[in-house]
């Protein structure tokens, strides 16, 4: 008899309705991976920020959905179904089931862990829907998982340089350019979620993974395009990595260029892509005189993305080779023995035959 293989897809989660916005934000700001303060302070800060932020954020959720909720779970379910179908083809002798574990709203990681336990999985593969590794996202999700689930598992760290992943991005970008009427004088902005600078300084590989991915994408789009990386969704008073997406849009729009803007750290449509990239930054571009502004869609169920995820799961099961795209060492959840980050930066994108663990 074949194995029961559970694949757990991790993402941040989002409110189901407008009433969930404040408690969702409170969960987010209570996370020590997001607010690095000791407990009583963190809980107070979480209550304060979530209360202050909720009214504005509620309006943004309401722009996407009449009920005021996030499309993230719906989009993640589509990805889970597509991945499960692909894995069923690749592993015909086994039973594969995809589970969804959200960090700050339903289905919570604890709920997913209980489901996996109940199902009686023989193998558990942990798959973050965050292509780049950050302690604030993947790291936080995995620690919640290990608190909730006591069995063994195999962990995928990150996959920003996987061939199918890079080409899926290029494909989405070129499709958006076609839709925009193939303009000339293009500036492609590759926008990632920002991080506080202190997080990067403490060893988080997220920023260099975003920037190395951006270089790979830049190498495959028309040579006369300007390409730059920028960081969106800054929250709070700390210093964040930059340049900020909004400032880049203003700078480029002032030159009257055609802007294409693509998300490179989000793989599903949600508030940051539909509202921030789709609506708020469009107004900035218009105000500063951009010739045009076109938002590139998130990867969603793009076949290249689903095959990236399929390949990562097979690699985690020891059935395929993959790219080692992370820094290894202290932060790496896959348990790679690690080598100096600088050496790995050079190696990024080099196909190797070692498997994780
Ligand atoms: C204050 C700190 C935050 C850090 C650091 C952060 C990192 C980070 N987040 C994502 C992906 C997503 N973030 C989403 C929502 C969201 N994130 C923060 C704050 C931080 N994120 C807040 C306060 C919110 C809520 C919305 C808001 O108040 O603006 C979402 C889900 C949104 C949805 O539609 O449901 C995702 C996905 C990444 C990739 C990342 C760093 C690597
Ligand atoms: Fe976020
Ligand atoms: Fe890693």
Curated annotation (Swiss-Prot):
Its EC number is 4.98.1.1. Keywords: Cytoplasm, Heme biosynthesis, Iron, Lyase, Metal-binding, Porphyrin biosynthesis. The lineage of its organism: Bacteria, Pseudomonadati, Pseudomonadota, Alphaproteobacteria, Hyphomonadales. The gene is hemH. It comes from the Bacteria. It comes from Hyphomonas neptunium (strain ATCC 15444). This is Ferrochelatase. Its main location: cytoplasm. Fe cation binds at residues 193, 272. It catalyses: heme b + 2 H(+) = protoporphyrin IX + Fe(2+).
């Amino acid at each position: 008899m074949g194995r029961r293989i559970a694949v757990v897809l991790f993402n941040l989660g989002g409110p189901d309705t407008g009433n969930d916005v404040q408690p969702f934000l409170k969960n987010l700001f209570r996370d020590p991976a997001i607010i690095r303060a000791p407990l009583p302070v963190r809980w107070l800060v979480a209550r304060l920020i979530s209360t202050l932020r909720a009214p504005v954020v509620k309006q943004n959720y309401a722009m996407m959905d009449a009920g005021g909720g996030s499309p993230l779970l719906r989009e993640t379910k589509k990805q889970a179904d597509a991945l499960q179908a692909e894995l069923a083809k690749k592993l015909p002798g086994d039973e594969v089931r995809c589970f969804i574990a959200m960090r700050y709203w339903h289905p919570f990681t604890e709920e997913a862990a209980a489901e996996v336990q109940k199902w009686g999985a023989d193998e558990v593969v942990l798959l973050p829907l965050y292509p780049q590794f950050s302690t604030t996202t993947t790291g936080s999700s995995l620690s919640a998982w290990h608190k909730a689930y006591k069995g063994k598992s195999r962990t995928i760290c990150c996959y920003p340089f996987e061939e199918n992943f890079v080409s899926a991005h290029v494909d989405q970008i070129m499709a958006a350019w076609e839709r925009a009427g193939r303009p000339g004088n293009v500036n492609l902005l590759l926008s990632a979620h920002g991080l506080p600078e202190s997080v990067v300084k403490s060893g988080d590989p997220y920023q260099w993974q975003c920037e190395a991915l951006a270089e790979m994408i830049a190498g495959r789009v028309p040579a006369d395009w300007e390409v730059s990386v920028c960081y969106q969704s800054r929250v709070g008073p700390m210093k964040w990595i930059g340049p900020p997406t909004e400032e880049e849009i203003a700078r480029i729009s002032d030159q009257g260029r055609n802007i294409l803007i693509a998300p490179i750290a989000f793989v599903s449509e949600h508030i940051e892509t539909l509202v921030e990239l789709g609506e708020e930054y469009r107004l900035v571009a218009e105000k500063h005189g951009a010739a045009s502004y076109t938002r590139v869609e998130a990867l969603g169920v793009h076949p290249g993305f689903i095959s990236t995820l399929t390949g990562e799961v097979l690699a985690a099961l020891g059935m395929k080779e993959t790219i080692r795209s992370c820094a290894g060492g202290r932060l790496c959840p896959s348990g790679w023995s690690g080598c100096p980050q600088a050496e790995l930066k050079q190696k990024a994108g080099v196909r190797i035959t070692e498997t994780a663990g």
